Amino acid sequence: SSDWSSDVCSSDLRKVLNEIEEKKIHLKQVKRVGTLGVTHLEHDIAVEKGLYYYQGNDFASEIIFSVRRLTEPSKEHVDNNFSPLNDIQKEDFSKMTESIITYLKRCAAMIETNDYHRLDDVIVESVSLTNQLTALKKGELKRIQGQSGSTKVSMVYLNMVQEAQNVVSFTANLVKVSRKFQKE
């Protein structure tokens, strides 16, 4: 669920970490099969398509790693019964999560349907989300300077926001390279 106002339990986070591991394994298999496929292409095509293929794989791997880096510290925090996120953090991150999920679904549909005519809109959306996430980080840093709340909780929160920002950025790059792979 994208509602961070409800308490996240350790088993939910463990489930996410297990799913991340499954995605990592799947991506490694896809990369191996793709590597074999690239070797069967004509040299010039193999060079060009191979580059985009490997870049796409790298961006997909980075997305998976960012989700893991977002989840692991959160799980440790929950497992150690540290203070939960405060109401402002929960509300702000919950709103951003909804927007990011919508964005990710839009990007996935674009790649799955191989329809990139709205690519510019997706790029504009990624910049907007990145700017909003940067604003969340700045707001949190101001709260830390004002010494309101737990620094440990703030560090977990800042990590969550940073990794969410990475997911947005890597996804935009994945869509761009996917278009190049398909169209060029």
What kind of region is each of these model predictions?
Residues S2-E184:
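Cytosolic, long alpha-helical scaffolding segments
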